[in-house]
Amino acid sequence: YTAQSSGTRDVIEWVMLHNLSGVEFNVYGVHLKASSGSSNANQRLQETTILRNHLNNLAPNFFIVGGDFNIYSNNSSSEPAFDMLTSSSDDNDGQMFDPINRIGHWHNNSSYSDVHTQSPRTSSFGGGANGGMDDRFDWLFVSQSILDQDSPMQYVEGTYWAVGNDGNHFNDAINDGNNNSVS
């Protein structure tokens, strides 16, 4: 499922087997269009629409989607891609859920500092983003079936972690001073 013919970015799919339950599940890696602005947000919507339609057609419905979504907020008017991923629709088989239920106004909000993944630096070099840790661009979403209590394959509470982030670097570089997550 890697090729998206509409000129958008590819999505990588792995089909895996959960050894304990025998459940076959799909894992997807994404890197959606970067940068702010309506044209970039519209491309993210196009990319997530293709993904959601693909997930709606899965059977059975066990999946994990992770990667750099580059989504700046959950505001449907400025970032309709987030709604495409997480909102209820006529077909909810492909609806995605945040297993830690930390959806809200994460941009530049210290209450979300433990899940921020961008930007790990405050100065610009090599073409990358700067500004310090103040956005949640990297996510792991799961299908409803993985969250169900009676499911043969379940999310294990407390295992979601923004790797390298100790929650103490809001608007700072991730390596500014001590970092209790990696040291």
Model-derived segments and spans:
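Metal-dependent phosphoester-hydrolase catalytic domains
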Residues: 57-63, 71-183
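A long, amphipathic alpha-helix that forms part
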Residues: 38-60
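Soluble non-cytosolic domains of exported or imported proteins
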Residues: 5-8, 38-46, 76, 131-135
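Structured beta-strand-rich core segments of catalytic domains in phosphoester-bond hydrolases
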Residues: 1-33
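Generic enzyme active-site microenvironment
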Residues: 29, 65-66
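Second-shell loop/turn segments in exported
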Residues: 1-2, 34-42, 65, 124-130
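Solvent-exposed loop/turn segments at secondary-structure junctions
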Residues: 4, 21, 32-37, 69-74, ...
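Extracytoplasmic/secreted envelope proteins and their assembly/folding machinery
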Residues: 11, 45-48, 52, 82, ...
